[in-house]
Amino acid sequence: MANDFLFTSESVSEGHPDKVADQISDAILDAIFQQDPKARVAAETLCNTGLVVLAGEITTFANVDYIEVARDTIKRIGYDNADYGIDYKSCSVLVAYDKQSPDIAQGVDEGAGIDLDQGAGDQGLMFGYACDETPELMPAAIHYAHRIVERQSELRKDGRLPWLRPDAKSQVTLRYVDGRPVSIDTIVLSTQHAPEMQHKDIEEAVIESIIKPVVPAEWLKDTRFLVNPTGRFVIGGPQGDCGLTGRKIIVDTYGGAAPHGGGAFSGKDPSKVDRSAAYAGRYVAKNIVAAGLAERAQIQISYAIGVAKPTSVMVTTFGTGKISDEKIAQLVLEHFDLRPKGIVQMLDLLRPIYQKTAAYGHFGREEPEFTWERTDKAAALRAAASL
């Protein structure tokens, strides 16, 4: 890649229909985990105008009112009026959960199947990434895209901009010089709004009250602002588009700055390595960068269903490493247990912590529950690398 370039990432608000689905799925997971931390959950959600469909595979002894959980989630997001696209009070909720296949369960249950350790819940490949572009060790474009829609939600909920509605999308294009971000070329924010609002008033409020408070002022050099570029955004949420769990996997991770293995996160308990190993990958990569071993770090981890040990672990630092990538990979294997059970224990994942992850990014947020954001291995890695 050339050292001078433009790079873009997007985010969406909690009221985006796909994120509504993600949050319902993770709210279901949390409600189950409050009673049964060892449950097997794969909760999928579809939401459309006035309709929510809950489907997937759940094996648990927990007694959960799934319909009430879905309604409470929609209410918390802010869809309390049918004019907004869906109303938690009047929407229909259909429940169609099956149990986990026993063929899968025997490969995941510890002490069953061919590998007596807890095996991976499926085959697949997962990526973790970190870089030094922000204090959170996240790529800058996705970081600021998240902060913009997070700010939109804040001003909507606290009443400072009461004409805002729940659905919104942001996009940030950064200008890089010599491989480092130096300014913002373009910011896009499309936000749902009350029908009586005029475009010029929306544009002014968005730029001054939403965007400027959360992006570096020194990066706003000849920046182009595109606010509701279609001119109107009244119909939104599940009425504007059908929402589905797992359809915002790039928003959930690194905004396209790193590869993605394809597996979504929300609604999945941590026996699914799609989720738990991606969290572990972030934990590993962030500690590599925090230790000063590299300015950028990417790890790929892969698994076979029913097998505990990863089938491969690869680290690349894009030429920024202080020691070789092979040496860093060896340190990773020595300091991190990447077997499914090891990940669950290392990151304390059998807790009802997941609904909070389902909007504004699973990574790069300093929340106390987000154990994969800790840098508690950095000192040991640095010492082992003799730096």
UniProtKB/Swiss-Prot annotation:
Catalyzed reaction equations: L-methionine + ATP + H2O = S-adenosyl-L-methionine + phosphate + diphosphate
Answer whether the UniProt record assigns the keyword Transferase to this protein. yes
Q: What is this protein called?
A: S-adenosylmethionine synthase
The residues the record assigns to binding K(+) are: E44
Q: Give the organism, scientific name.
A: Herminiimonas arsenicoxydans
Q: Where does L-methionine bind?
A: E57, Q100, D241, K272
EC assignment: the record states: 2.5.1.6
Localization, UniProt: Cytoplasm
* Record text on subunit structure and interactions: Homotetramer; dimer of dimers.
**What does the cofactor field's note say?**
Binds 2 divalent ions per subunit.
Q: Which UniProt keywords apply?
A: ATP-binding, Cytoplasm, Magnesium, Metal-binding, Nucleotide-binding, One-carbon metabolism, Potassium, Transferase
Q: Which cofactors go with this protein?
A: Mg(2+); K(+)
Q: A single GO CC term, please? A: cytoplasm
Any one GO MF annotation of this record: methionine adenosyltransferase activity
NCBIfam families annotated for this entry? metK
Task: Give the GO terms filed under biological process for this record.
Answer: one-carbon metabolic process; S-adenosylmethionine biosynthetic process
